Amino acid sequence: MQQQTPLDRTLRCPVCQLGLSLDRQQGSPAHLGCPAGHRFDAAKQGYFNLLSGKGTNFTQDGAQMVAARASFLDAGHYESLAEALGHRVRTVLRGYEHPSVLDAGAGTGYYLRQVLQALPGTTAPSAVALDISRYAMRRAAKVPNTVALVWDLWRDLPLQDGAFDVLLNIFSPHNGTEFARVLRPGGTALVVTPLPEHLAEGAGSLGLLGIAADKAAGVVAAMGEEFILTATEEVRIPLVLDPPAAFELAMMGPAGHHLNPEALRNRLSDAGNATLVTAAFRIQEFRKVDENRIQANLEGLSSSG
């Protein structure tokens, strides 16, 4: 019988909700299977598409969008945001030997990789990356100690109850009910959204979409009553981008679904000048309510009275 791994305690069959076990062959992910006999084979790039046969009503980020995002992020333009997230995760996981991390809406896995690398060398983390884009999961599957799953965040997550210590939710849908289910009591969720002024200077020239002014309040509402907002941090990054980098910035986000790539590339090339913008983000740190601890405190107060 195959030895159980930490990941076997985090995954759940999307068909019957029994636990999923990961089978590796020659060190690479090969199959996911449950006791009821449901089986999912890994794609040759190492990710698993659990939406097979179900599909989704949402549009995945395409190959060009994902390639633009990978190139832009790997160039280090948003490194300050990754460092801020790494610092927070390192702080909340201090003393954990085998923490479990979920990146819900992981994209290429850039932030997940940076966060895992920020943990002490004595830590042996396991991670799950979820995203609706199979093109993104091809890249996220390369993050060490990570299982990459194609999945729709608005559905019940293919994950076990209370399986994760930390959850990352970066520029992605906030399924607060499911986030609360899969986080352990007292676990931490880090939600990143753009500030209203994010990239405002380049909105016209780059064809970017507008940003709602009330995103912070919307996140709190979406996370629900099982989470308490414990900290907020704003990160601003001034950027000076040449035409190729500006093209990648425009194509990698939601506007990439609507832009004409060649028209944008030609417009930026003809202009020739650098694009000056400021990336602006808000990190909201939430703690999942630990009802057992609350009850214990109440009982302690009652007995002392």
For each predicted feature, which ranges?
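Class I SAM-dependent methyltransferase SAM/SAH-binding core
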Residues: 100-103, 108-156
